[in-house]
């Protein structure tokens, strides 16, 4: 588990809040920026398809993620879209050839 992921889990445990599933899609023409955006998103969710992530985020995590992404985006060239899914919509997601979106839970013993 990366340090960023550990920090996100520690933060989540501390705030003990509700999360929302976000489907995050990005279109970044520059290879270096695209790689950086991909690395940032890997610390917050699951890479499901090329340029597409599923992330279960609290409000604070969403703000943190957007802030980190904004540091690397060129507004006139890059696009990142956040699609929130309600709990009922997550349950109704249909997949072919892959697992449905589920929140990874961390249990500390």
Language-model features: locations:
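Basic nucleic-acid-binding interfaces
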Residues: 2-4, 8-23, 29-109
């Amino acid at each position: 588990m990366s340090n960023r992921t550990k920090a996100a889990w520690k933060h989540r445990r501390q705030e003990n809040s509700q999360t929302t599933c976000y489907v995050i899609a990005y279109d970044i023409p520059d290879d270096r920026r695209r790689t950086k955006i991909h690395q940032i998103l890997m610390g917050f969710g699951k890479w499901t398809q090329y340029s597409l992530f599923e992330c279960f985020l609290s409000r604070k995590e969403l703000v943190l993620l957007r802030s980190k992404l904004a540091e690397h985006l060129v507004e006139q060239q890059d696009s990142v879209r956040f699609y929130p899914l309600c709990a009922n919509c997550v349950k109704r997601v249909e997949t072919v050839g892959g697992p449905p979106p589920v929140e990874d839970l961390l249990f500390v013993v």
